A protein has these predicted regions:
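Short aromatic-rich membrane-water interface segments that cap or initiate transmembrane helices
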Residues: 132, 161-174
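Short helix-perturbing small/polar motifs within transmembrane alpha-helices
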Residues: 2-50, 55-158, 178-208
Length: 208
């Protein structure tokens, strides 16, 4: 009996690990596709892209999960970011610090939102919206842009501030416009398709 219970527990743990791995892989793939499209389609002068919604999936993914589970998704996204920059951006060497800046931006925004109080990812009031805009739309892209614009300026011989302004605007607007819907979907408040929940039930978000 004890062996059966132990085996069942191990199977459950394996399912959780596989689930986490699959979700992380999907995050990395989605980031790579969005980032690649942004670089190819909205990078007009060889500098920073003018539209950047790619950070939003990472931000939303981290914001609804405990910080102790962030390392895997951050590493996977960093690899995806480096690959996109290497293939379609300003090269593999510049892609290393750019991926650090982008992943740090998503993590910082999510950390501020999680530390801001009681479940601010639900957007149930003006305070949660204000903290979200402050974290993901102002502080995180402004700070990440310092490194990002510096790397771009160094490798393209362009001016720093125009690239910082383009980075800040693109990352801020991209995350603000996309992340709220992603957060609601991840929390189960928006259903994909026609499936409906019975009245009186609440969706619970797994943190794995």
């Amino acid at each position: 009996m004890s062996l059966a219970v132990t085996a069942m527990r191990r199977m459950i743990e394996m399912d959780r690990v596989v689930g986490r791995t699959l979700k992380t892989a999907l995050l990395a793939v989605s980031f790579f596709l969005i980032a690649s499209a942004s670089i190819k389609l909205t990078r007009f002068n060889g500098g920073a892209a003018f539209l950047w919604p790619a950070t939003a999936p990472l931000f939303a993914f981290l914001a609804v999960r405990p910080a102790r589970t962030w390392l895997g998704p951050m590493v996977a996204t960093a690899i995806a970011s480096w690959a996109a920059s290497s293939l379609f951006g300003i090269g593999p060497l510049a892609g290393i610090p750019l991926s650090i800046a982008i992943v740090a931006e998503g993590a910082l925004g999510a950390l501020i939102l999680r530390r801001g109080g009681n479940d601010l990812t639900s957007f149930d009031g003006l305070r949660s919206l204000a903290v979200f805009v402050l974290a993901a739309g102002l502080i995180a892209p402004a700070l990440s842009g310092l490194l990002g614009a510096g790397v771009i300026a160094l490798h393209t011989h362009q001016a720093f501030w125009p690239n910082w302004q383009a980075w800040f605007a693109a990352h801020s607007l991209g995350t603000i416009s996309v992340a709220p819907l992603l957060l609601l979907v991840l929390r189960g408040k928006v259903r994909v398709g026609s499936e409906r929940r019975p009245r009186g039930t609440r969706s619970r978000l797994p943190c794995c």
